[in-house]
Amino acid sequence: MHRSTTALVLCLAPMAISATHSASAGPDLATRLQVHGFASQAAVHTSENRWLGDSPDTSTEFTELGVNASLRLSPRLLVSGQILSRRAGDMYDGAPALDYGLADLKLLYSDAYRLGLRLGRLKNPLGLYNETRDMPFTRPGIFLPQAVYFDKVRNLVLSSDGVMAYGELYRGFGSLAFDLVAGRPLIDDNVEWAYLNQDFAGDLDIDGVSWLGGIWYSSLAERFKLGLSWADLRLAFDPDAGAPFTIGPGQTDILYWIASFQYNAEDWTLSAEYAREPIEWR
């Protein structure tokens, strides 16, 4: 049986709003405060794929709106955040939510290196596109490859509440960078359907601290980029007492990793990623 999906997206380019200031606000507020936004609207025609819900024909329920701001409080400290509204079929209803909100502290920095900490709701540094996956003009296509960036569990891999250590070393051959996150990713009903195949009576939540990280190499001018990123987390299910038709308590261990490659030419980019996600239920 022939199945097909056709998509069209209308993207509004990034909007930048300069901060106005008065004498009492300080003459440099406009250089320290930045506000940006983006918007996109897609139309999807599919035969029988049921893309993100019951959409067998044509659907326009694919809208993304984002507003973000950052304020540099000092040469070492930056605070930033983003509110995102995302409508995607039956899975996301467009309710505004905090996408990220963090404080970024530079511990050490020079022309040769930088080392810092981020605290708050963090975008998980997984693969080439996870941190910017909701900005349509950063994606390689209308939708990201679902083998690597599975939208059904998007919230689980998108961001975490926790702390991140990051660093970068600049040399004549390019740069080496690392990220290490300790925190708690976000859980929603879509995650339970994806890993347990049903919305059972009970609670599915993150068990303990989850660890995420990545190491990256970029050549001069970022012509080549190579990276390996990973997430190690555990989901625990606690069934409701006396509930019929449920499963017993248990844990799902997930080790998710992505190998990434990118080549940037003047007029085109070649990207390739390979992902594995071994899962163990016990």
Predicted regions and their residues:
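Outer-membrane beta-barrel transmembrane domain signature of Gram-negative proteins
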Residues: Q34, F38-T60, L228-L233, F237-T252
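Signature for the C-terminal beta-barrel architecture of outer-membrane proteins
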Residues: D90, K106-L117, V153-R282
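Cleavable N-terminal export/targeting peptides
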Residues: M1-D28, G141
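Cleaved targeting-peptide boundary
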Residues: A19-R32, R50-W51, E192
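Outer membrane beta-barrel
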Residues: P27-V35, A42-H45, P56-D188, Y217-L220
